[in-house]
Amino acid sequence: MKQFVQRAGGRIGLWGGLLAAALAAFAAGWLVPARAPVGCKLNELTAAPDFSPFSPAAPAVATSDAGTPAAPSLPEKWVCLTLDDGPSKTTPEVLAALDAAGVHGTFFVVATGYNEKYLPLLTQAAAAGHQIALHSASHEYSDIYRSSAAYWKDIALLKQRIAPYVDAESIRYLRFPGGSTNTVSRRYGGKGLMPQLKTEVEQRGWQWVDWNVCAEDAVGGHPSADTIYRNVVRETGEQTHCVVLMHDSATTRTTAEALPDIIRWYADNGYTFLTVAEALPLG
């Protein structure tokens, strides 16, 4: 590249053009923020033998590779389709795909201020039978993982912002940004923060929810719908109890395109679609 610029007579117009193109791509949602990949694949973060996507306090509905039998009321094979980081301009397409298939999903929502105009979609999603769960107000790791107090302040702000659209006080399911085994929290709150937060969630009678299938739809490069579909099929493998991580943010529009094929594959392979609350009912 240095030689190319020198041959071009030292002009910087090329760099200005590249910068302008990159900024335009980011604005259009084709470039994914650097924080998005954190926590996508739990087994790449910390060793998690006998991994279950649910809190330890959960009933016996752990994943099949954990060797824990399903609760009697649950089907032999089930899948929870979960979507993080919405609502956004992508959410109507996601809802349309789910509704067309007669399938209910679970939305772990954010309320960053940037997506404020899409928050009314939560009312529509809840009315259609989809589950609304908590994710983060800001999704800024450096803010929410400074301390336990900072994390719960963020959750309180999230509930406040979504309260006009859903019954926020009744929500008892959440997903930690980056997942429960994320390592990014250690940079800001220390090694003991995540164990503390998990304990505090359980003490409230809530459940935190991870995943055991990652669509890898937010790992950068704007993966195609076909790539997302193949990622889900590959990661599902022989598992019979699946919690699938996907996103309905403005930067993951191809996830909505992939959903019909993902749903069809699970249906063809004998899976029953559940919300997280159906797979993990709380008393």
Residue ranges and their predicted role:
Residues 11, 15-16, 66-68, 117, ...:
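Sparse, context-dependent recognition of short Cys/His-centered cofactor- or disulfide-binding micro-motifs
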